Structures are given as C-alpha cells and as structure tokens.
Amino acid sequence: MLLLPLPLLLFLLCSRAEAGEIIGGTECKPHSRPYMAYLEIVTSNGPSKFCGGFLIRRNFVLTAAHCAGRSITVTLGAHNITEEEDTWQKLEVIKQFRHPKYNTSTLHHDIMLLKLKEKASLTLAVGTLPFPSQFNFVPPGRMCRVAGWGRTGVLKPGSDTLQEVKLRLMDPQACSHFRDFDHNLQLCVGNPRKTKSAFKGDSGGPLLCAGVAQGIVSYGRSDAKPPAVFTRISHYRPWINQILQAN
C-alpha cells in the first residue's frame, strides 16, 4: 500500500485540508474560514507546489513540515485562488521553522512554523485560529472539520475554491495499517466506512474541533481512502511557544 504526504495525496476536505482538495466535502461560504492560508512553494529542484496552512499570529502561519521549500508565498483572505480579490493579502515568508526532529521516512513531527515578512492586517476575511494547550487531549469519536484547496478526487485537479468536510476522530487502532503511526504524536482521522477525506493539496491545513485547531493534515493512502494521519498539535505546544517567544 502506497503512502503519500498530503501534498501528494488527495483527501476529503470540508473538515480538513492538504495540498490538494477535499473529497466528499462542500464549498465553504466565501471568507467564512478567515484563518486559512494558501501556500505557494518553490522547491529546491525548481517545480512549484502548494499546501494549506493557518494563521496563528499576525506574523506566523502553522503548516506541515513536508510543505517546506526554497521560498514560500502566503495568500490570506482567499476563497477562489484563481480570482484575486481586495480581501487578499500576499505575504512573503522570511523564515521557515521546520521541526528539528522531522523525519521524511516516517513523517513523524510533520509540523512547521512560517514567519511572515510583514504582519497580516486582521479583517473580516483574515483572522487567527486558536490552537490547544499541551495537555489538551481530544477524544476519539469527536466530529471535526478540515478545509483546503486540495483535490476533490484521486484523479481530479485541485479545487479553485475553498472546500470543507466533516471528519470523525478515530481510535488509534483504525490507523494500525500505517506502520509508523504514533498516537502520541498523531491523530487518526476519518471513518473508513465513509468516502470523505483530505487529499493532495490539503497538506498543512488545520483539523478544527470545537473551534480549536487540533491537527495538521499530514498523510494518507494513495487512493485517498480514510482514515488519514494528522499531526497532533497539542504535543508540540512547548516547541511552538519557544519559536514564537524567540521570534
């Protein structure tokens, strides 16, 4: 079974996002998710890719470590990423803080902070999203949401408009087929009996549970069948705090 990071996978997004689109989701009401960030990434070998992310401070975006690149431009306040609006704020990333223990083989510690060159202006279309404390443990069974511009199907292109999908947090056993899944570091998301998921292009987007970002779209199966694996944000709160305080 082939496993791919979300920028290479297509997941069902109306509740979570990757670097593609949401599968089994619906289009969000324009600008109803003001924390969402669209990342245009220039890679070291030339080709561009894109990911999702979310604004946690006026000058910091949280995303997945596998979304790192030679340079990154962040677009805030977007709904249709092909039609520029007055709500858009395009900001350059001046520093990428990829977690020092990020492992490209296991995709453990798939989390990264992006420092923006300028602070975002908070508007009706651009806002920050709260994230959990270190010991905030969200239980299996909870319904959450993920959003993104990723693929809406395995063989479909990315979505122009922001999509969202509702996904259920699963027991860790549901992700036992992922050899490197670690319940302490990650969340298992998406009912395997449903056809909803996040996929390629949704990577880096937030898993929103009761208004709090609990997870980050990380990886899943190459056929986009749920469940998928999300980075557990609460585990990394001390590291996040350290970066924010030092910068």
From Swiss-Prot:
Signal sequence, start to end: 1-19
Active site: H66 (charge relay system), D110 (charge relay system), S203 (charge relay system)
Catalysed reaction, written as an equation: Preferential cleavage: Phe-|-Xaa > Tyr-|-Xaa > Trp-|-Xaa > Leu-|-Xaa
Sites carrying sugar chains: N80, N103
One Pfam match: Trypsin
Molecular function per GO: endopeptidase activity; peptide binding; serine-type endopeptidase activity; serine-type peptidase activity
Disulfide bonds: C51-C67, C144-C209, C175-C188
Gene Ontology process terms (BP): angiotensin maturation; basement membrane disassembly; cellular response to glucose stimulus; cytokine precursor processing; extracellular matrix disassembly; midbrain development; peptide metabolic process; positive regulation of angiogenesis
SUPFAM superfamilies on file: Trypsin-like serine proteases
InterPro entries documented for this protein: Peptidase_S1_PA, Peptidase_S1_PA_chymotrypsin, Peptidase_S1A, Trypsin_dom, TRYPSIN_HIS, TRYPSIN_SER
Tissue spec: Mast cells in lung, heart, skin and placenta. Expressed in both normal skin and in urticaria pigmentosa lesions.
Residues that make up the propeptide removed upon maturation: 20-21
Annotated Gene Ontology cellular component terms: collagen-containing extracellular matrix; cytoplasmic ribonucleoprotein granule; cytosol; extracellular region; extracellular space; secretory granule
Enzyme Commission code(s) on record: 3.4.21.39
Keywords noted in UniProt: Disulfide bond, Glycoprotein, Hydrolase, Protease, Secreted, Serine protease, Signal, Zymogen
Role of this protein: Major secreted protease of mast cells with suspected roles in vasoactive peptide generation, extracellular matrix degradation, and regulation of gland secretion.
Name of the protein in its database record: Chymase
Organism for this UniProt entry: Homo sapiens (Human)
